[in-house]
């Protein structure tokens, strides 16, 4: 397919995958690196000597990146992981629970051509942390592998792409299945030229918005700049592993990322400067409309922006968002005071921190339309604004650059 620099371009690739049966495969997958705690990592290490956490997020003993590369090479040599003989795009059905309701999200694993944000083709919406990019770049240099996918969304309001995908896998058996806790995964490989061509042609009419994986995407751009000189236009280094999902998919869920603050003096002063406080009942949390809720010592207060609050430092595209107001008006001074700020998408876990004296800022989740509006305006939301649930596991579909 001729390359048009003004449209998104995806390509099939030969995935590296585990050869285990469904009853074992779930023990080998892990979450992406940025949601693995040290305790999670220890558990996953003990779960199997071949759990993908050893590659995705190795323990910091000695040279962790060399260790990850050595493990991956050894697994390939032993046949623990095998590369598919033919290139394909990979349909991934991910079933999970929201409360007691079972939900399915469908996405496509493919190779997505890299574009800088200013080209307006692959659109970021969130700022990143330099340290995380340094870590991912070191891993990419050592393994020469996209170990986990970026998560992108695209417009498909009329179901053109979703319908085409369904037709290609209808009545066929998945090539891989896995169960991880209450989540189920099924993967189909579409390797025929017509199926791949239909998906590429349909997606070429659309922008791709990065939902999750901004650090991995920027790392891939940095690696291309570092080592891509003289590479062919279709060289693997010019693409990144992506999991792409329709913005209208009923399984696309976005949670808020709440702020947990330890050290309250600067926070209280900032609140009183910019906001009015209104006590509310804890049971009303689920009904809260736009705003920020402060929780401390069992007390819940909803914040209302004062009429004379100066929002000139906040970009117009996102100054109405609670997360932007919290970051720009409240937490900037808190960080300068030396207080500790952590992030938690689970509301119950965030509230549990108040028992140890922390203050929690509960924030409303950002909807997909707002993300598109911010990205189309060329703006970036603060780090840790969104949490797309559930995460796409690492190890299910891996993309070597060799």
Q: Which residues does each PLM region occupy?
A:
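Surface-exposed, charge/polar-rich loops and edge strands
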Residues: 1-402
């Amino acid at each position: 397919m001729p390359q048009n620099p003004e449209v998104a371009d995806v390509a099939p690739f030969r995935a590296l995958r585990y050869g285990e049966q469904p009853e074992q495969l779930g023990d080998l997958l892990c979450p992406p690196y940025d949601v693995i705690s040290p305790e999670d990592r220890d558990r996953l290490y003990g779960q199997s000597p071949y759990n993908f956490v050893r590659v995705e997020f190795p323990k910091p003993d000695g040279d962790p990146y060399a260790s990850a590369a050595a493990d991956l090479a050894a697994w390939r040599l032993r046949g623990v992981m095998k590369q598919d003989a033919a290139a394909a795009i990979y349909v991934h059905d991910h079933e999970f629970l929201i409360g007691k309701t079972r939900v399915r999200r469908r996405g496509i694993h493919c190779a997505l051509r890299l574009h800088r944000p200013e080209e307006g083709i692959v659109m970021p919406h969130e700022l990143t942390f330099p340290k995380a990019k340094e870590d991912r770049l070191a891993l990419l240099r050592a393994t020469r592998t996209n170990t986990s996918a970026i998560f992108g969304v695209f417009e498909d309001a009329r179901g053109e792409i979703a319908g085409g995908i369904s037709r290609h896998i209808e009545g066929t058996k998945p090539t891989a299945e896995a169960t991880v806790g209450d989540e189920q995964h099924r993967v189909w490989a579409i390797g025929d030229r017509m199926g791949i061509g239909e998906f590429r042609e349909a997606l070429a009419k659309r922008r791709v918005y990065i939902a999750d994986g901004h650090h991995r995407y920027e790392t891939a751009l940095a690696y291309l700049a570092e080592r891509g000189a003289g590479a062919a236009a279709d060289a693997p280094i010019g693409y990144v592993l992506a999991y792409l999902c329709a913005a209208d998919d009923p399984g696309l869920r976005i949670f808020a990322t709440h702020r947990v603050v330890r050290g309250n003096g600067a926070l209280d002063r900032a609140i009183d400067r910019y906001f009015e406080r209104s006590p509310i009942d804890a049971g009303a949390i689920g009904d809260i409309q736009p705003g920020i809720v402060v929780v401390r010592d069992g007390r819940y207060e909803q914040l209302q922006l004062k009429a004379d609050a100066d929002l000139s430092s906040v970009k117009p595209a996102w100054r109405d968002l609670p997360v932007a107001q919290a970051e720009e008006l409240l937490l900037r001074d808190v960080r300068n005071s030396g207080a500790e700020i952590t992030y938690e998408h689970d509301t119950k876990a965030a509230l549990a921190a108040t028992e140890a004296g922390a203050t929690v800022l509960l924030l409303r989740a950002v909807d997909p339309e707002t993300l598109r509006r911010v990205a189309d305006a060329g703006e970036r939301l603060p780090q840790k604004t969104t949490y797309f649930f559930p995460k796409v596991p690492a190890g299910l579909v891996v993309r070597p650059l060799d």
